[in-house]
């Protein structure tokens, strides 16, 4: 069984944050703390190999953890951040969480690790109703597939998952875990829920 200490983790903070008015989402405050700090708190209780993928504010993010940008230009989405994480991290298994989901559970790493089988390429969180495509654990052997996928202009993570041996980790006991804060309205709306 894959152990959490055999994995490394990347917080995805490389987006353009258009719905947040272009403000770097990782530094948006939620409950008096930057979203990047919520993400770090989630992971530091579970693992010690943590990095950040960002395409701006790299110096600021570097104060929190090792930070690296996408290797593909023009913001091709979270898949580019995943590619960069797989290339830059040392472990065979690399996990990813978004910077804008401050309610992820403290056992996220072990739940994803427990779903890994011998031939698994990717584990994706599933909340009982929906797949959560950017809360995932990937094996480095898929780097060539992601590279080819992005090079040909594909961006939809779900299509990549169909090309790989993808399994799901059950997070149905955590119905509010995957709330995403993409806009000022969502920050306000979910501030009392979490």
UniProtKB/Swiss-Prot annotation:
Q: Which Gene3D superfamilies match?
A: Spore Coat Polysaccharide Biosynthesis Protein SpsA, Chain A
List the source organism: Aliivibrio fischeri (strain ATCC 700601 / ES114)
Q: Describe its function.
A: Transfers a GMP moiety from GTP to Mo-molybdopterin (Mo-MPT) cofactor (Moco or molybdenum cofactor) to form Mo-molybdopterin guanine dinucleotide (Mo-MGD) cofactor.
The record's gene field reads mobA
| The keyword Cytoplasm is assigned to this record | yes
Q: Which NCBIfam families match?
A: molyb_mobA
Q: What is this protein called?
A: Molybdenum cofactor guanylyltransferase
UniProt note: domains:
The N-terminal domain determines nucleotide recognition and specific binding, while the C-terminal domain determines the specific binding to the target protein.
**Which residues participate in Mg(2+) binding?**
100
Q: How does it assemble?
A: Monomer.
InterPro entries (alphabetical): MobA-like_NTP_Trfase, Molybde_CF_guanTrfase, Nucleotide-diphossugar_trans
Indicate where this protein is primarily found.
Answer: cytoplasm
- Write down the SUPFAM superfamilies for this protein, in alphabetical order: Nucleotide-diphospho-sugar transferases (SSF53448)
